[in-house]
């Protein structure tokens, strides 16, 4: 093909803290769920570590689900730590949606030197160098909705094909303007 497409391979680590509610203590079947909108690039999910225990993640359509059991003695108001990792392959961009119920921090580090930060929420800190970039978003439930997203688009700045096309279009424009003005 004459066109190059930007693809990425990423290792995603998700961790956090979930407060236990009175309703979840009483319920027998508690589920931990997360959604991946484009499942094609998703691979190698780890087990979910939840409250010091490990649980298998299983796929249900676009969601991954684990039936979880609270640690002995857990009560409403306690906070449970969770973590899991997976590999994600994709093209052109990587976006995240913040949690509606708490604070969300997303940190991205890459060796790609041409990021374009996109979405309703821009990074709080970012550092772009010739050998890559780092960016961090910190979002609270007060300044986001479930529809806000944040992420990065991997831009290919003016490759030779784009430059040739641009030159041809501007050349035609100048020729047309000369004839119209004359």
Language model: regions and residue ranges:
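Hydrophobic alpha-helical transmembrane segments
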Residues: 121, 145-151, 169-176
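Generic secondary-structure transition motif, activating predominantly at the C-termini of alpha-helices
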Residues: 139-141, 156, 168
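Juxtamembrane membrane-water interface segments that cap and precede transmembrane helices
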Residues: 150-159
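Soluble non-transmembrane domains of integral membrane proteins
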Residues: 1-148
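Core alpha-helical transmembrane segments of integral membrane proteins
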Residues: 159-182
